[in-house]
Swiss-Prot record:
Similarity field: Belongs to the chorismate synthase family.
Record GO terms (molecular function): chorismate synthase activity; FMN binding
Keywords recorded for this protein, A-Z: Amino-acid biosynthesis, Aromatic amino acid biosynthesis, Chloroplast, Lyase, Plastid, Transit peptide
PANTHER family, alphabetized: CHORISMATE SYNTHASE
PTM field: The N-terminus is blocked.
Entry EC number(s): 4.2.3.5
Example GO biological process: aromatic amino acid family biosynthetic process
Catalytic activity: 5-O-(1-carboxyvinyl)-3-phosphoshikimate = chorismate + phosphate
Transit peptide start-stop: 1-57
Subunit structure: Homotetramer.
Protein name as catalogued: Chorismate synthase, chloroplastic
Pathway: Metabolic intermediate biosynthesis; chorismate biosynthesis; chorismate from D-erythrose 4-phosphate and phosphoenolpyruvate: step 7/7
CDD domains, sorted: Chorismate_synthase (cd07304)
Length: 447
């Protein structure tokens, strides 16, 4: 009995190498396929009656290998949020734990942030039962309540200079005009929500702390060494609206932001982030170095333009003998480094010292000053952008940076323990993968 093969056309057929069309490719036609038929194989071709529709789907909304986070929503849609997959079960979490970081990120919190009024109240819809994670996907959602779509009527046709308006059109041929869609900083709500959970797990398991603060606003730069990273606290960072732990420089930064805010302009700045009590051994050699993972995570945030780790670019002015972190043994017999120009990571792997890095944020691109631009029809015009926007993004970027760093660290920690258990198991239902249970994990046995 002869076999039968049916084919479905894809863009007029299958590709084969040729030079007849000048591009190096041509296509099998239906007659070519019929010529392949013989007594044992019969090929029938069904013609496409309706025109093909090419659907473009945006990717890149998911992050992480084990602790995976997918964000969703747009600035002027019904809401924003995230779905977290891979969270360890039986860990205590509440909406209040997440809300505290969302409050640090939300708009309208001070005169130097966007005046948009959103409470950003989160709700957990799945993955948590009786206050504990279940191991299934966790869905966290935040509604949008203060949209003003009419503010973006001019941007429907004109591109904001240095904004994603133009590149979204270049890539997709269509975009969400109101609020910039996915390019809006409201997308980061999902990241901050997931990061709040990640920070709590890191703290419970290893005592790991992630703290970020503003170290530069426009031309006001916090001097190196003025902040003690060994003792820095969240209370110091949150003591003022710009989130600079030094009160004197905080006032200077606020004044610099105010000066451009009243003119409808904007400025950029730098966020410094430190990680204390990071377990040794996180990260991998070559492509998955810990600093590479951190750089990718932080550079995925809106408005980021630079990343510096450890000694950063200033290290290029030193010799090897000046830059090397010499080892010693401390009073507890633990191998440490006397200096930390490596920034807590060597060879792509954490060494147990404080990890430190800096992220540069550009000035907000949507400003209330007249600028030259073009329309979608390529007409050159002048644009004064309306809407409510931050005169400087760095005060609200602080919890965003902390979130992305925490997501990387937890994902790397779980990868490190991929062949064991992150937390103590339920002995009534599970068998241990290892006879050794860390003291930190054992402390959560009652969870």
């Amino acid at each position: 009995m002869a076999s039968s093969l049916s084919t479905k056309p894809f863009l007029s057929g299958s590709r084969r190498r040729s030079t007849t069309d000048g591009s190096g490719w041509s296509y099998f036609q239906t007659s070519d396929l019929r010529q392949l038929s013989n007594q044992s194989v019969q090929i029938s071709v069904r013609r496409q009656t309706a025109p093909l529709k090419l659907v473009v789907q945006a990717s890149g909304s998911s992050f992480g290998k084990v602790f995976q986070v997918t964000t969703y929503g747009e600035s002027h849609g019904g809401g924003v949020g995230c779905v977290i997959d891979g969270c360890p079960p039986r860990f205590p979490i509440s909406e209040a734990d997440i809300q505290s970081d969302l409050d640090r990120r939300r708009p309208g919190q001070s005169r130097i942030t966007t005046p948009r009024k959103e409470t950003d109240t989160c709700k957990i819809y799945s993955g948590v039962a009786d206050g504990f994670t279940t191991g299934s996907p966790i869905h966290i959602s935040v509604p949008n309540t203060d949209q003003r779509g009419n503010d973006y009527s001019e941007m429907a046709k004109a591109y904001r200079p240095s904004h994603a308006d133009a590149t979204y059109d270049f890539k997709y041929g269509v975009r969400s005009v109101q609020g910039g869609g996915r390019s809006s900083a409201r997308e980061t709500i999902g990241r901050v929500a997931a990061g709040a959970l990640a920070k709590k797990i890191l703290k419970a398991y290893a005592g790991t702390e992630v703290l970020a603060y503003v170290s530069q606003a426009h031309k006001v730069v916090l001097p190196e060494g003025l902040v003690d990273h060994e003792t820095l606290s969240l209370e110091q960072i949150e003591s003022n609206i710009v989130r600079c732990p030094d009160s004197e420089y905080a006032e200077k930064m606020i004044a610099a932001i105010d000066a451009v805010r009243v003119k409808g302009d904007s400025v950029g700045g730098v966020v410094t982030c430190i990680m204390r009590n990071v377990p040794r051994g996180l990260g991998s050699p070559v492509f998955d170095k810990l600093e590479a993972e951190l750089a990718k995570a932080c550079m995925s945030l809106p408005a980021t333009k630079g990343f510096e780790f450890g000694s950063g670019f200033s290290g290029t002015f030193l010799t090897g003998s000046e830059h090397n972190d010499e080892f010693y043994t401390d009073e507890n017999g633990r191998i440490r480094t006397r200096t930390n120009r490596s920034g807590g990571i060597q060879g792509g792997i954490s060494n147990g010292e404080i990890i430190n890095m800096r992220i540069a944020f550009k000035p907000t691109s949507t400003i209330g000053k007249k600028q030259n631009t073009v329309t979608r029809e390529r007409e050159e015009i002048e644009l004064i952008a309306r809407g409510r926007h931050d005169p400087c993004v760095v005060p609200r970027a602080v919890p965003m940076v902390e979130a992305m760093v925490a997501l990387v660290l937890l994902d790397q920690l779980m990868l490190q323990h991929a062949q064991g258990n992150l937390f103590s198991i339920n002995p009534a239902l599970q068998e241990p993968l290892s006879e050794t249970v860390s003291s930190a994990a054992a402390s959560l046995q009652g969870v």
